[in-house]
Amino acid sequence: MSLFTILNGPNLNLLGQRQPEIYGYETLADVEADCRAIAEAAGHELFFAQSNREYELIDWIHEARGKSAGIVINPGAFTHTSVAILDALNAFEAPVIEVHISNIHKREVFRHHSYVSTRAEGVIAGLGIEGYGVALRHLINLFSRSS
């Protein structure tokens, strides 16, 4: 049994309420339930968290070092601004998958750049909340092949 980490950045606590035409009507609790079911079915544990504070995301990334077999991260707006989150992810030794509910490349130009994607093994954007499950399954498969 291994631990996998899913981190969510600013405003994702409003999922299902904020701009549902872009992000959908599912809530972050729905995302967590789906991901817990995937992890448990594969015999793994899951740490799932959300914060509007950059330092908390960084602290959770640091805490995952040596403990988590991989991180799925939706950094929200920090995607486009946070070198600090990138630096924390660069200190994390296991795989990272970046997830975005919307397709950031079809949105405003300032959303097209991601600091996180330079560290991520993969980037999933535009699949709605299903992107989380795709990312988690991929990390579980990577872990299974390396064990």
Curated annotation (Swiss-Prot):
Pathway: Metabolic intermediate biosynthesis; chorismate biosynthesis; chorismate from D-erythrose 4-phosphate and phosphoenolpyruvate: step 3/7. The active site is at residues 23, 100. Substrate binds at residues 74, 80, 87, 101-102, 111. Disulfide bonds: none annotated. This is 3-dehydroquinate dehydratase 2. The record marks 18 as: Transition state stabilizer. InterPro entries: DHquinase_II (IPR001874), DHquinase_II_CS (IPR018509), DHquinase_II_sf (IPR036441). Catalyzes a trans-dehydration via an enolate intermediate.
